[in-house]
Amino acid sequence: MSDNVVERGMRYLKNNGVKATLKRIKNGPAPIPPKNNLLGFYNFVVNTEEIPFDKKAYEEAKKSGKITLNWVIPEMSPGSGGHTTIFRFVSNLEKLGFHSKIYLYMSPTFKDNESIRSFLKQHFPLLDERVEVYCDVSQMGFAHGTVATAWTTAYYVRRFNNTISKFYFVQDFEPYFYAHGSEYEFAENTYKMGFRGITAGDWLKDVMRNDYGMTADSFLFSYDDKIYKPKEKTDDKPRVFFYARPVTPRRDFEL
C-alpha cells in the first residue's frame, strides 16, 4: 500500500471517526438514497458539517512550492460537453504548473478509483495523465483552491474549509434545468455562497455579478480547430440553423 493511500485513509479516519471508516472499508462509498427518500436524497443540501482546515497539510504544501487545485465534479457520461471543457481547463493548468485533483461527488456508478480512471482514459483521452482522479470526495485533502462545477457540488464545497480559496466553474444557468420549484431554488441558492465565479461567456458573468453579487470572470467560447474546420461556401442560398433537443424542456422544442 502506498504512503499516499495510507495518508488518505488516516485523513478520512480523522474527519469521520472509526465507525464510519470501518463501514466505508467494508462497503465503499455510500450509495445515494433514492429520490423518494426525500430527507436522505436532499441531505447534501442541509448538511452543514464543516470539513476543517488542515494546517499541517497547508505547511507541507508551502514547502513544496506547488499550487494544487481540487475539482469537485458530478458523474459524467461518455463525451459529456461540460466535462470535456473542465478537463481541457484542468489539462492546460497542469501544463502551466498548477496540479489538479479531480473528485466525483455522489457518484452512483464509480465505487473505486481504478474504475473512474479507466473510464476517463477510454472516453476522455484529452485529460492530462498527471491529473489525479478519485471516485469520492471523502478522499479529498488540502488544496490551495477548490472548485465547484455544478450546483450539487457547490453544497459540498461550501462546507469544505480545507482550502484557501473557493471557486465556482459555471457553464450554464442551472436553475433553468428545472421547473420553478425546489430544485430551481436549491440550484439558484449556490450563486449566493460567496465563491469566485469562472463563467462560460459574458452573459453568465453578468448574471452572476448583477443578480447575485458574485465576483466573476469569464472565458470565451471556443472550438478545436484541429477537428472542426469551415467548409468552403458553394452558393449564396440562405440557411437556418435549427438546434433541436426534445429531451431538454428549456429548449422549447415544441414551439
Spans of features found by a protein language model:
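Membrane-proximal helix-turn-helix segments that form the acceptor-binding/catalytic region
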Residues: 134-142, 180-197
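Short hydrophobic "strand-cap" motifs at the C-terminus of beta-strands
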Residues: 72-74, 200, 242-245
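Conserved catalytic-core segment of nucleotide-activated headgroup transferases in glycan assembly
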Residues: 85, 91-94, 101-104, 210-218, ...
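Active-site proximal beta-strand in glycosyltransferases
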Residues: 147, 160-176
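N-terminal pre-catalytic "stem/leader" segment of glycosyltransferase-like enzymes
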Residues: 28-141
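A short, active-site helix/loop in glycosyltransferases that binds the activated sugar's phosphate group
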Residues: 152, 156-157, 177, 193-216
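Boundary detector for helix-to-coil junctions that initiate low-complexity/charged tails
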Residues: 1-29
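Acidic anion/phosphate-binding donor-loop and adjacent secondary structure
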Residues: 46-60, 175-182, 217-237
